[in-house]
Amino acid sequence: MKPQIYILKNTHLEVHISTLGATLTRMLTKDLQGKVVDVLLGMEKAEDYESPEYIASGAYLGAIIGRYGNRIARGRFEIDGVKYQLAINNGENHLHGGLCGFDKKIWNVGQAGTDSLTLTYCSPDGEEAYPGTLQVKVGFSLQEKALRIDYEAVTDKKCFVNLTHHPYFNLNPEAVKGYFT
């Protein structure tokens, strides 16, 4: 399945979201002079997020992070006496969901509107060695001058879950012209 871009708009904001990694790719708003600027650092084109170079970079620009955001020491944890060994992808640690975390998955569209979008993903039992099937829903909604992100996760086994997003906001676009976008 090919990733799709959805555009949310209201009077103050325009937000572009890719189904690849539930990634925020652009956030357009007016600066103090009334000029429309993109305040997210990201790749130039949506398809650049699929390039081998970007994937190998470990940048996570604007993407959802999961099943577990941050590091798990040595990729190990224990729940109810059962030991789990996750993939090691950051020195000796497990980072941001592993080698093929939620940032690399194509998400399904649950609902799409002009100012809101709901994406869903089902992470099967054993994916990246995590226990339990995990049903995830992330909702994006524009509210005046804000982007709201809501997360919902339900699992059928005990498991750690720590979802987050990884956007980089640039409030001075002139300072980094040509760096990413």
Located regions from the model:
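Surface-exposed acidic/polar loop and edge beta-strand patches at domain peripheries
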Residues: 1-181
